[in-house]
Design a protein with these regions (language model features):
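Beta/alpha (TIM)-barrel catalytic core signal, keyed to glycine-rich beta->alpha loops juxtaposed to Asp/Glu
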Residues: 1-132
């Protein structure tokens, strides 16, 4: 970002990576300082697939959050808190629809203490199976 004058940046703003490794902290600060748009992807990713695990989304190389509305909303709010102006949904219609259905809440309501606690708990469980 110091070499070119970008208007936007596409970056994986994943809550488990952020909580466990501080992933995304530097880019989040930089885009805020420079007034650059931030497109957040991988917000709805839980962890890597486990070997032999059933994969209902065969084109996905990582396990999406599905069936846990509270975690999905908290994960989206985390990405917005990090500075995402736009969230890029996963590639299937169900997840795309989930993001559309919950976008307003993510941009108008802050993460609650309960949501933070849930994200930290889930991040601890995913610690050894992070996507990067």
């Amino acid at each position: 970002l110091s070499m070119f004058d970008f208007d936007t940046v596409l970056f994986p703003l994943n809550w488990a990576l952020g909580i466990n490794r501080g992933w995304g902290d530097r880019i989040s600060e930089t885009v805020k300082e420079k007034g650059i748009g931030l497109l957040g992807m991988k917000a709805l990713v839980r962890r890597n697939w486990r070997e032999g695990e059933a994969r209902p989304y065969p084109k996905s190389w990582c396990q999406p959050i599905w069936g846990d509305e509270a975690l999905g909303v908290a994960a989206m709010k985390y990405a917005v808190l990090k500075g995402a102006h736009t969230l890029v949904p996963p590639g299937n219609f169900e997840h795309f629809s989930f993001m559309l259905d919950h976008a307003d809440a993510c941009y108008t309501k802050a993460l609650t203490d309960e949501e933070w606690a849930m994200l930290r708990r889930e991040a601890k469980e995913a610690e050894k199976e992070l996507i990067f």
